[in-house]
Amino acid sequence: SPSLDDERNDNFVRL
C-alpha cells in the first residue's frame, strides 16, 4: 500500500 488511501482500502476489503 504505497498511499494511505490504499492502506485504508485494504483494511476495508479485508473486512
UniProtKB/Swiss-Prot annotation:
Protein name (record): Extended FMRFamide-12
Function of the protein: FMRFamides and FMRFamide-like peptides are neuropeptides.
Example of a GO cellular component annotation carried by this entry: extracellular region
Keywords, in A-Z order: Neuropeptide, Secreted
Entry similarity comment: Belongs to the FARP (FMRF amide related peptide) family.
One GO term (biological process): neuropeptide signaling pathway
Broad class of the protein's primary localization: secreted
Domain of life: Eukaryota
UniProt source species: Namaquaphasma ookiepense (Gladiator bug)
Disulfide bonds: none
Record's subcellular location: Secreted
